[in-house]
């Protein structure tokens, strides 16, 4: 495994892990994650693909409280890493990382042979965080990361209440969330700052696989459906029995879906 390093236009150091050889898969993790979020997925891919996994700047070690963060910054970071890679590049994103991937592709569609977007929480008809994001930010500022986590999972992600309480009752889980909380708040704010609507993607004529979990929250599936009728070359893949975190609950299933979509595009 190698590490790729480059510098963003504002001087921020960007890193990515580089495994395997073959056609290039470029993976962008979701909220509160990092390059290791894909650890369960890549063993099924690295024998046939070069797999590059970036760590998004707001979740990098020592990132602190992000200043003036936006999806434009995220997209530029994706493009900076993509510029280091041999083409063709098949771009994969999960959750807010899928939004960053989509925004990057919109800015430079020629850089990517295809897209694989797993439940991007795009504000298609409504904002993602809205009032709940303000409540989560307030709880975090008050020194209560557990309550901020509860609000995020219950009111923004919209997980079932009983599952949320189980997760919040786990001190290790709360500690992990607390370590990523500033980035997660900035992430949701950046999503909402995009504004409601997706008409701009009608011109993005790149083969796109939109992926949903059968058990995922309804709002994520609705947002995905809105993108499906907007993107010119979109098709939807449903992961049976899965929710919003198949990279953890069924990594081989997700890897198979990535492989199938990539081979369809890359040949």
Model-identified regions with their sequence ranges:
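Conserved HGGG/HGGXW glycine-rich cap/lid loop of the alpha/beta-hydrolase fold
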Residues: 5-67, 87
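Conserved serine/cysteine hydrolase catalytic core
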Residues: 175-229, 235-238
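Catalytic active-site module of serine/aspartate enzymes centered on a nucleophile-bearing elbow/loop
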Residues: 232-267
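Conserved alpha/beta-hydrolase catalytic His-Asp/Glu region
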Residues: 146-183
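Conserved acidic catalytic loop of the alpha/beta-hydrolase fold
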Residues: 73-89
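Glycine-rich His-Gly loop
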Residues: 27-31, 95, 213
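Conserved hydrolase catalytic core segment
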Residues: 88-126
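Short beta-to-alpha linker loops that shape the active-site pocket of alpha/beta-hydrolase fold enzymes
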Residues: 55-60, 121, 240-242
């Amino acid at each position: 495994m190698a590490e790729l390093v480059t510098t963003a236009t504002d001087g921020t150091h960007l890193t990515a892990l580089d495994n395997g050889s073959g056609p290039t898969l470029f993976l962008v993790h979701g909220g509160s994650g990092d390059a290791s979020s894909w650890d369960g997925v890549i063993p099924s891919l690295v024998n046939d693909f070069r797999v590059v996994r970036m760590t998004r700047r707001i979740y990098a070690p020592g990132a602190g409280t992000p200043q003036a963060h936006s999806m434009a910054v995220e997209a530029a970071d994706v493009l900076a890493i993509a510029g280091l890679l041999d083409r063709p590049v098949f771009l994969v994103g999960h959750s807010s990382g899928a939004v960053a991937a989509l925004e990057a592709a919109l800015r430079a569609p020629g850089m990517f042979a295809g897209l694989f977007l797993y439940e991007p929480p795009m504000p298609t008809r409504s904002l993602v965080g809205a009032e709940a994001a303000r409540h989560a930010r307030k709880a975090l500022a008050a020194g209560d990361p557990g309550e901020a986590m509860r609000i995020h999972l219950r009111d923004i992600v919209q997980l079932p209440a009983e599952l949320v309480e189980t997760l919040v009752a786990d001190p290790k889980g709360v500690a992990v969330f607390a370590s990523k909380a500033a980035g997660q708040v900035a992430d949701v704010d950046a999503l909402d700052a995009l504004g409601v609507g997706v008409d701009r993607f009608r011109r993005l004529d790149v083969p796109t696989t939109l992926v949903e979990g059968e058990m995922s929250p309804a709002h994520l599936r609705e947002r995905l459906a809105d993108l499906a009728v907007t993107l010119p070359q979109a098709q939807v893949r449903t992961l049976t029995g899965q929710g919003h975190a198949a990279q953890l609950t069924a990594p081989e299933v997700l890897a198979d879906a990535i492989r199938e979509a990539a081979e369809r595009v890359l040949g």
